[in-house]
A protein has these predicted regions:
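Formylglycine-dependent sulfatase
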Residues: 1-269
């Protein structure tokens, strides 16, 4: 991959790096979702743009770089994950997920109200993006588009095409999987994000998502029910349970990445 990983292949994300720009020393001023988005939009630190944490309503009256692009003659669009509560401003077109948004069948906010779409969210965001690029813009004007995916956010629900990918293989474990956080600053030990202790039944796909269509649920259950049955019968404990949790987590994560990579390729093509 562009950053040297050999666990999975991401040819389209790698193409972005090859044909665009890659950062080896990139930093954020606020690492959680909504504040980081606000910093990108405004170019201001969180205490100046007002978005200090998740759950706050972004002040869309302030200056943002999409507004400056509009003033310079660009058509602008925002599609996908917004997560800032207020409606997007500075965009000629927008269609955004509500809050975090689900992985399947997302309701999407638009200037005309809520639009409900059936399908896998990563594919849908790309579909809307391509439709605007082909049919929604003035092709005589320059354009700027923010096409922002939910994936691979927790709880890592793979798309229907990838539900069984990586089955039958063991992916390498990271050296930090059994980290005891000794001699580390306290936040490292107090965070609630360990594979061992903090993955829920939903994270581990021990039950199907509740918002699937009958067809989607049938595909989901066909993929996960046999694996979950084998897990229940194994009655794993201790380190063997940790190993199982890691494999379930990392495979679902990479399955989500595969969908993102495919859809990046659709846009680039």
């Amino acid at each position: 991959s562009a950053y040297g990983s050999n666990r999975n292949k991401t040819p389209n994300i790698d193409r972005l790096a090859k044909e665009g720009m890659i950062f080896h020393r990139a930093f954020v001023t606020n690492s959680i979702c909504a504040p980081s988005r606000a910093v990108i939009l405004t170019g201001k630190h969180s205490h100046l743009n007002g978005q200090l944490t998740n759950g706050m309503r972004f002040d869309g009256e302030q200056q943002t770089f999409p507004k400056l692009l509009q003033k310079s003659g660009y058509q602008t669009a925002m599609i996908g994950k917004w997560h800032l509560k207020s409606d997007p401003t500075g965009f000629d077109f927008w269609q955004v997920l509500q809050g975090q948004g689900p992985y399947y069948n997302p309701p999407m906010n638009t200037p005309d109200g809520v639009k409900r779409i059936t399908g896998y969210t990563t594919d849908i965001i790309t579909d809307v993006t391509l439709d605007w690029l082909k049919n929604g813009r003035d092709k005589d004007k320059p354009f700027f588009i923010m096409s922002q995916h939910k994936a691979p956010h927790r709880n890592w629900q793979p798309g229907p095409k990838h539900l069984n990918k990586y089955d039958g293989i063991d992916l390498p474990e990271p050296e930090t999987l059994r980290d005891d956080y000794k001699n580390r600053l306290s936040p490292a030990a107090t965070q609630a994000m360990t594979v061992k202790n903090h993955l829920s039944a939903n994270d581990l796909k021990l039950r199907a998502p509740g918002n699937l269509t009958p067809e989607q649920k049938a595909k989901w259950n066909a993929a996960y029910d046999p694996k979950n049955k084998a897990f229940a019968e194994a009655k794993l404990e201790g380190d063997e349970l940790l190993k199982w949790k890691y494999q379930r987590y990392v495979k679902d994560y990479l399955r989500c990445i595969d969908s993102v990579d495919e859809n990046v390729g659709r846009i680039l093509d």
